[in-house]
């Protein structure tokens, strides 16, 4: 890892008036030029971390570093960090130009330089020609672009974004995800994004921190977080999951529903109680006699791209299946899956223990060398 641009070292926060501890020994290093997301439900502590970075809140204990310099006592205006707030915090009585130029005017930058940089920045956020437009006459998406332009015009080392997409409708929110990600990559500025939306975090981030009750439960790439959740909370919080109690018979062999199945997980004690995760999209519907499990369809909903089917096995376990095929309520179907579709979770495993075990024991698929090569490989395997 290169020298971190931001470091949190054992940072905790307790509100003195209520005695509530909202952050518990937070530790992380952020690299320059990456897109990071703090993901968690309301009250998980994610916005508190953002406010401590910005200097809006003081940490109760621990150290915060910006580019190697301890900044716990550094005033907000001395930190090379800019924040985009949820409500955008724009000046309603000013034009787009005046809002974006505000920070440059405070620094007494030359007027010609201000005009040049405002024009360049508005072009970056697709608001070229909006300089004289009143803020009050802009749409929600346009206001958000103004807030982002104001945050990046000084080319800060870090931009903090506190749920800036939450007020937008679904279509515009999706468009802005692409725009934000592309803008961050083009500028090379470190973005720290706060959201409760799992899909948003997975789609935009280089690295995700999953938070719960003031702690970082798991951190990793979006693919790692989704495919290898550390515990029940993460598996449930990130996407949809079928979570079944099981027993790890030995390395790469797990038992649940009274049957034994091959897996790609290891590094656990023989006959250790575990939880088994199978994502709904990884379950294939087949004939009852051909399935590894048999379930009875209870209900289904059409979700546009797939049917969401709820079924129950003979032990009463609920199964969610995503399928492009429509089922019939009351019919018995078979469920098939591969060893790679099973993810085994130990009970009460720390992130350090989890990472070490995954690296040593879990058999990971080799990365695909593009879609075309992957399709050709599949066809070659079918022809063997």
UniProtKB/Swiss-Prot annotation:
SUPFAM superfamilies found in the cross-reference section: MOP-like, P-loop containing nucleoside triphosphate hydrolases
Keywords: ATP-binding, Cell membrane, Membrane, Nucleotide-binding, Translocase, Transport
Cellular component GO terms held in the UniProt record: ATP-binding cassette (ABC) transporter complex
Localization per Swiss-Prot or TrEMBL: Cell membrane
Record text on subunit structure and interactions: The complex is composed of two ATP-binding proteins (PotA), two transmembrane proteins (PotB and PotC) and a solute-binding protein (PotD).
Function summary: Part of the ABC transporter complex PotABCD involved in spermidine/putrescine import. Responsible for energy coupling to the transport system.
Record's protein name: Spermidine/putrescine import ATP-binding protein PotA
Annotated source species: Streptococcus pyogenes serotype M3 (strain ATCC BAA-595 / MGAS315)
């Amino acid at each position: 890892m290169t020298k971190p641009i931001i470091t949190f070292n054992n940072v905790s926060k307790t509100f003195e008036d209520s005695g509530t501890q909202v952050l518990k020994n937070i530790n992380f290093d952020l690299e320059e030029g990456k897109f990071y997301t703090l993901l968690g439900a309301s009250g998980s502590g994610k916005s508190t971390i953002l406010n401590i970075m910005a200097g809006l809140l003081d940490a109760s204990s621990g150290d915060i570093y910006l580019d190697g310099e301890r900044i716990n006592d550094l005033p907000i205006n001395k930190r090379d960090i800019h924040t985009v707030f949820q409500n955008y915090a724009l000046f309603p009585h000013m034009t787009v130009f005046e809002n974006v130029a505000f920070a440059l005017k405070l620094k007494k930058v030359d007027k010609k330089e201000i005009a040049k940089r405002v024009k360049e920045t508005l072009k970056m956020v697709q608001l070229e020609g909006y300089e004289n437009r009143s803020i009050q006459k802009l749409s929600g998406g346009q206001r958000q672009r103004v807030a982002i332009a104001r945050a990046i015009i000084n080319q800060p080392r870090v931009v903090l974004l506190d749920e800036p997409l939450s007020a937008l409708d679904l279509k515009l929110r999706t468009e802005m995800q692409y725009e934000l990600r592309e803008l961050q990559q083009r500028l090379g500025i470190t973005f720290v994004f706060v959201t409760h939306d799992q899909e948003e975090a997975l789609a935009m981030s280089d690295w995700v921190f999953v938070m719960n009750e003031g702690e970082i439960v798991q951190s990793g790439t979006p693919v790692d977080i989704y495919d290898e959740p550390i515990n029940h909370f993460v598996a449930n919080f990130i996407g949809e999951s079928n979570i079944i109690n099981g027993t790890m018979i030995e390395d790469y062999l797990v038992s649940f529903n009274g049957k034994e199945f091959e897996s790609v997980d290891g590094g656990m004690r023989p006959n250790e109680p575990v939880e088994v995760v199978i994502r709904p999209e990884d379950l294939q519907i087949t004939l009852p006699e051909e399935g590894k499990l048999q379930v009875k369809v209870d209900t289904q909903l059409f979700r546009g791209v797939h049917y969401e089917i709820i079924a129950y096995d003979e032990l009463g376990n609920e199964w969610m299946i995503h399928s492009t095929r429509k089922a019939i309520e009351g019919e018995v179907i078979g469920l098939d899956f591969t060893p790679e579709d099973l993810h085994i979770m130990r009970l009460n495993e720390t992130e350090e223990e989890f990472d070490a075990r995954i690296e040593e024991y879990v058999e990971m698929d080799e990365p695909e060398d593009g879609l075309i090569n992957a399709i050709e490989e599949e066809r070659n395997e079918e022809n063997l």
